[in-house]
Amino acid sequence: MAVTHSVGDMLTKIRNASRVKHESVDLKMSKINKSILDILREEGYIKGYNIFDNKGISFIKAILNYDSKRNPAINRIDAISTPGRKVYSSYKNMPRIKNGYGILIVSSSKGVITGKQAKDNKVGGELICSVW
């Protein structure tokens, strides 16, 4: 079965891998997936990622982050927009995640940015996912 929502597939793979405490997870390469992983790395939710090819298809190996007691840095990661239901927000109505402890990832005219950056730059956009 073909994957129609690469972002949702990526979020599900990260969620499942962190729950069973895998060191890393392989994801399909796409520009939006890479942009989301850049934000997760900047915010400390993943250690980093590597891009590799397998039989002509590009993949990303995301290295997950855990604390000293092997608790995952990502407690919850949820998709907000789906292919069948896009959710948009202006910068004035940008929701807060876990009272400011989580992050919101937004696709805007400035690229893929966090909800805080969207408020600071006064741009709205499509709400991709929330992480805490």
UniProtKB/Swiss-Prot annotation:
InterPro entries registered for this protein in UniProt: Ribosomal_uS8, Ribosomal_uS8_CS, Ribosomal_uS8_sf
HAMAP family, alphabetized: Ribosomal_uS8_B
GO cellular component, one term: ribonucleoprotein complex
Annotated Gene3D superfamilies: 3.30.1370.30, 3.30.1490.10
GO BP, sorted A to Z: translation
Organism: Borrelia hermsii (strain HS1 / DAH)
Coiled coil: none
Pfam families listed in its UniProt record: Ribosomal_S8
Family of this protein: Belongs to the universal ribosomal protein uS8 family.
Name of the protein: Small ribosomal subunit protein uS8
Annotated GO MF terms: rRNA binding; structural constituent of ribosome
Role description: One of the primary rRNA binding proteins, it binds directly to 16S rRNA central domain where it helps coordinate assembly of the platform of the 30S subunit.
Keyword list, A-Z: Ribonucleoprotein, Ribosomal protein, RNA-binding, rRNA-binding
Complexes and interactors: Part of the 30S ribosomal subunit. Contacts proteins S5 and S12.
